[in-house]
Each structure stands twice: as structure tokens, then as C-alpha cells.
Amino acid sequence: MGDLEKGAATHGAGCFAKIKVFLMALTCAYVSKSLSGTFMSSMLTQIERQFGIPTAIVGFINGSFEIGNLLLIIFVSYFGMKLHRPIVIGVGCAVMGLGCFIISLPHFLMGRYEYETTILPTSNLSSNSFLCMENQTQTLNPAQDPAECVKEVKSLMWIYVLVGNIIRGIGETPIMPLGVSYIENFAKSENSPLYIGILETGKMIGPIFGLLLGSFCASIYVDTGSVNTDDLTITPTDIRWVGAWWIGFLVCAGVNILISIPFFFFPKTLPKEGLQENVDGTENAKEESTEKRPRKKNRGITKDFFPFLKSPVLQPDLHAVHPYKVLQVNAFNIYFSFLPKYLENQYGKSTAEVIFLMGVYNLPAICIGYLIAGFMMKKFKITVKTAAFLAFCLSLSEYSFGFCNFLITCDNVPVAGLTNSYERDQKPLYLENNVLADCNTRCSCLTKTWDPVCGDNGLAYMSACLAGCEKSVGTGTNMVFHNCSCIQSPGNSSAVLGLCNKGPECTNKLQYLLILSGFLSILYSFAAIPGYMVFLRCIKSEEKSLGIGIHAFCIRVFAGIPAPIYFGALIDRTCLHWGTQKCGAPGACRMYDINSFRRIYLGMSAALRGSSYLPAFVIVILTRKFSLPGKINSSEMEIAEMKLTEKESQCTDVHRNPKFKNDGELKTKL
């Protein structure tokens, strides 16, 4: 019975004692972590509107994930090598799930979302205070004492999102450094690029599901089930619309916890891929005995930490890699974190539509590119020198084509008092006193309220009152306003709720932009895999996990944390009109100067990426002049293969020779 149980246990362990099974589990972890991260990025505008906070704070929330990573990355990368790496990864996935759950809590702890409006949900002529009426002062619906602003439940609820994102970052910490080093240690060197390509593909599959989930959640009203959506006076294209962001985070929490389970069944070490089973046993025994040596002394692990830390930090080969990646990640963090906001404001689309289009055009192209790049590196056994040169050329080509984005633009929606005068003349700046004109001074309108209507003349107005409208017909989003004194048109001088559409020409430009973006995504993914392999080969095998950790540390300190914060502050400077909360305090931005937004958004990304190619060129030179620690030249490879063949033939002879009666003699011979 004991032998049967031992055999069953061995068989069970054997199912998980394979590098490809671990690769599959790690790919799922990459999918889950990128699913959560992409969904978070896609919901930034929803969080901004839900809590009425500026973009700078939203950028801080986005960067808080990197803060969580930063707290543990180096220690996990080093001490994780001494511990059971798969189990540490499993715990990390579970912690990510906890973080996602905490992010969703504010929805259950605060009241319903009340957007800024003076319009009642039903057309009641006795209560049409939102229309142009002489000798009557408008108020937001409902009104509160401004002193109550700080007491609003939602005023600090965004801190839950901040803390949850930090915890999510802590949980994500061990996945990349420990997972990649685990694969690098036990995979064939020629298979490593393909495996890394599969991981990177998993990292792109996650965003596909994340964007689809984000698109679905953004199309559902945040308080669905507790409000009658027919009474809403806003649509998904309205900048005040908030989608059901909390649903997606609950889904992400469940996925992360489920993905964590398989990692608790993997062994601490795996057989080296490509070696015979008997040789594997010998090598693994050596590895295990080596790993157990430091445990003879309690302080053995911590004693060597700081001396060990110096090696990758002071390694000359990595000096050019760090600034290159920091500049690149700054640019990409800015570009992808604020891409939904840019497309919404530039092309006048809803969050749900923008997120869906991003997933359709960009991510499949990146996935295909990752797989092809990994396969080509394995197929042609591309050297480190060639990989560095190839990555440099492809990345530079993608960067050059990216300047076409500056040409595919749309103008601001014309809004009287903001971008245009009431006579339709364009104005360079927004001045608060310009929102009033001779046609609406008698109406006693609120000048800060954002209840936009689109007139028959193609000009939008900040509210029906500011358009001089005196009558309304219909309910909800079907409400129509008549007798509008500020609307000069040959027709009925009427207006409908919402901003004016940007027209089919702008929609066509969005299609051109997305096609260009898909093409650039393919070039980017072709360059990413060889570039990442150059980085891995710059690190000694025994320092790989710590080297990856230090690299991630540098990226988080100088790119992941500051980029969304400083760029969010720059975006706030392009705001033309800030929203107003119930109590009168400023809320989220309602309209941006899209021309300034475009120059900052595209210009900052281009400047950061352009400056990154100087250290990239240095990397190409270094790989040609110096022998990298992770590189194996052809002669060494031939000698290793000859030794392996000789050992395998000895192993075969030993099995055929009857004079070896036990395993001890067999191991002695080997």
C-alpha cells in the first residue's frame, strides 16, 4: 500500500514537474494580471467622473500600482530565489485578487451617483427652472450648503481605489521576476525566446479580455438595477456618464484567485529541459543540495544580500539598458494610460466604443507579432548582437511612422462661450464672463453648470438656459427645447440634449488612426521580443531574478509612478471647463482644449521615445564589442553538446551492462 501511495504521489508531482506545464500556468497568470491592469486603465475616466476628481489624482491612483510593486520588488526578486518560487507566485496572484475586491468596495459603501444637472427627469412645466426664465435664479438639483462638501461620503472614497491598487501592485510583484527566472533556469536556451514570446502573448491576451470587459462595463450605467435608466438625461457619449466599473473589478478578483491555485502544486525545481531523465535526476540533486547549503546558517540568506545586490547594479552592460527602458516606459505609460481619454475627446466617441476599438485593432496585432518574433528567434537562432540591432531598427521604424498621428486630427466641438463666440467666431481662450451674451443675460443662468445642448445651427451651448430656450418637450434623453433666443437659424430655433456630433469626417479619421495603430503595434511587437532577450542576456544566470527585479525597480521609480502623475497634471492644464459638484465645489473636467491636449499627449510621448534611442544605440555598440554574461558562443555550445552526447551514450551503456546492480553504482559511473 505504501508503494502504491508513493507511486501515486510521484505521478501527481510529475504532472506539474514539467516546464511547459509551468509555462501554461505562468501564461495564465500573465493573462490575469494584464486583464486587471488593462481594465484599471480603461476605467480611469469612469473613476474620475464617479468621484469628481482631477486627472492629476487619477494619475496618482494609476501610479499607486507601481508604488505597491516598488515596496517589495527587489526583496522578492532576491529572497524569492531562496524560497519556493511557484508558491510565492501563487500567493501574489491571490493578493492581486484581494486588491481588486477592495477597489470595488466604494460602490457598496457610497450612495447613488448623482451627475451635475439642473434638468428634472420628467418634463414638468411648473418646475422648469432649468429654462430661460426672467427674475428667477437657477440652482443645481438638489442644492446643498457648500460647507457640506467635505462631509460627502464620496469625497474620500477614492482612497479605497488607491489602497486596493497598491495591494494589487504588491501581489503582482513576484510574477515576472520569479516566473521568468524559473523558466530561464530550467528551459533550453534556444527555447527561451519562444517561451518569453508566449508569455508576452499572454500579457497581450489579458488586455484583449480586459478591454472587452471594460467596454461592456462602460456601456452599463453605474447604478444599474437601482435606478430607472429611462429617466436619465445623459447617454454613454456624455462626459458625465459613469459605467459600472465595479462589476469588472469583481470579475478580476475572481479570476486572479482562481489562477493562483495551480502554483501551489509545482515543485521548487524542475528537470532541465532537453536532458535525459537519469541525467536530470543527477542535476536536480546537485541543484537541491546547492540550494540547501545556505540553510545551514540562519543568516546565510540575508548576509549575502547587499554584496549580491552590487553585482547587477554595477554591471556595465546594464547601464544603458536602464535609461532606455525608463524613457520608453514613460512614453508608453503616458500613451496607453490616457489613450481612451484622448480618443473620447478627440473623436467624440463613448468610452465603451473607444475601449472596444482599441481591443479590436491593437491587441491582436501585438499578440501575433509576439508569437512570430519568438518563433523567428528560435527558428534562426538569432544571436544577441543580431537581436540588439534588429530590435533597434524595428523600434526606430515604428517610432518614425508614429508621427503620422499628428496629421489625423479633429477640432473641438464648437461650444458658445468656450471655443466659439455666440456669433460662431472662434476664440483663443475661455473666459468665464464670455458664457453670457445679450441673448441670455435676462435668463439669470448659472454660468458653471454643464448641461450641454446642441442647437439647430450646429453650435452647442453649456445649458438650455444659456441657449435662451424657454420651452421643453419630452422626457429623459429625448427632451427637445424650443424658442431658443441664442440660436440663430432659419428653422424653429430649437435644441436637443447633448453636444453636437463631430460628423462622419471625424469618424473616418478615427478609422485611419486605428489602422495606423494596428500597423505600429505589429512593428512594436516584432522589436519587443529580441529587445527583451538582449536584456536577459545582459544578466548572469545566477543573478537573473535579482537583475530583473532591479530593472523593474528602476522602471517603477522613474517611469511607472511619476509618468501618470505629471502627465495628468499637464492634461488638467488643457481643461476649458470644470464640472461642479452638488455643493458647488469643482469636480471633474467637462471639456478640454483638444488641440492643446493633442500637442501635449502626442508631443510628450514622442519626445520621451526619441531621447531613448541614444542609450539604445549605445546598447547596440556594447553588444558588438563585449561578451555578455548570458551569451553562449558557438564553440562553447558545441563543447556542451559533445559532453551531453557523451554522457547520454555512457548512460545507455550502463543500462545495458549487467554488472551495475544498483543505483549507487550507476550514479558513481555517471
UniProtKB/Swiss-Prot annotation:
UniProt subcellular location: Cell membrane
GO molecular function, one term: sodium-independent organic anion transmembrane transporter activity
Main location: membrane
Gene Ontology biological-process entries: bile acid and bile salt transport; monoatomic anion transmembrane transport; sodium-independent organic anion transport
Glycosylated residues in this chain: 124, 135, 483, 492
Ranges for domain Kazal-like: 433-488
Function: Mediates the Na(+)-independent transport of organic anions such as methotrexate, taurocholate, folate and prostaglandin E2. May contribute to renal secretion and/or reabsorption of hydrophobic anionic compounds. Mediates renal clearance of methotrexate from the blood.
Descriptive protein name: Solute carrier organic anion transporter family member 1A3
Gene name as annotated: Slco1a3
